[in-house]
From Swiss-Prot:
Pfam families: MerR_1 (PF13411), TipAS (PF07739). Residues 3-72 form the HTH merR-type domain. The lineage of its organism: Bacteria, Pseudomonadati, Pseudomonadota, Alphaproteobacteria, Caulobacterales. Coiled coil: none annotated. This is HTH-type transcriptional regulator SkgA. Keywords: Activator, DNA-binding, Transcription, Transcription regulation. Regulates the induction of katG (catalase-peroxidase) in stationary phase. CDD domains: HTH_TipAL-Mta. GO terms for molecular function: DNA binding; DNA-binding transcription factor activity. PROSITE patterns: HTH_MERR_2 (PS50937). PANTHER family: HTH-TYPE TRANSCRIPTIONAL ACTIVATOR MTA (PTHR30204:SF90), REDOX-CYCLING DRUG-SENSING TRANSCRIPTIONAL ACTIVATOR SOXR (PTHR30204). The gene is skgA. Residues 6-25 bind DNA. The keyword Chloroplast does not apply.
Amino acid sequence: MSVYTVKQMARLSGVSVRALHHYDAIGLLKPRAVGANGYRYYDRQDLLRLQQILFHRALETPLKDIQAALDQPGFDLAAALRAQRERLAAQAERYARLVDVVDRTLADLEGDETMDDKHLFEGFDPEKQARHEAWLVEHYGDEATRRIADAKAGMKSWGKKDWSQFQEEAKAIEHDLAKALTQGLPVDSAPVTAIMRRHWAWVGRSWNREPTPDAFAGLGHLYQANPEFTARYEAIAPGLTEYFSEAMRAFARGR
């Protein structure tokens, strides 16, 4: 049976050594053995468990729920793979529709075809948005209801270019913050503060009003409390959710 060190495991799977250490620390993926020299060693069963973790992450499952699923008594790997295949196939179909919308939108912007406005949002998941809004209202009450209404009112006038820029900026902020995390930058460092300044502006655009410091810090708490946000950020980089939230609170304190 093949045995892998943590570096070999990282090269084989594409998961960083830092992430594997994090998974070990939280009990999600413990090495099969630890040598007298402190080296972690993994076997094929560990590879299959890591594969499961990555499938769950692709499906935006929160880390704590992944661990609960994998550690349940009588866990059936083959059954889990079949269920994941079904969900991934459905997701692939939705992504294919989104790719088609991207292509048609680009063709519209470049003057090659005219795209009806009603087709701009084909392929997006209205159920997911509805779940997110319901969660906000449940946890934050009437204030969340008002903010959702304000945001929707502001976005009604957005065109294709507005939506594209909004989404690209969100991805850029997440990418830059994940890079800061891997570099070990403090949340109140100048580079992270600059990223948070961009996020502050992005949130203001999303809400159709400038956030207060308390509201901005509260949004950071929401990122940690809401499973869908947690799944999104942890899929980008392990530990990003907490880092993002702390950076937002640090920025809010300085406003």
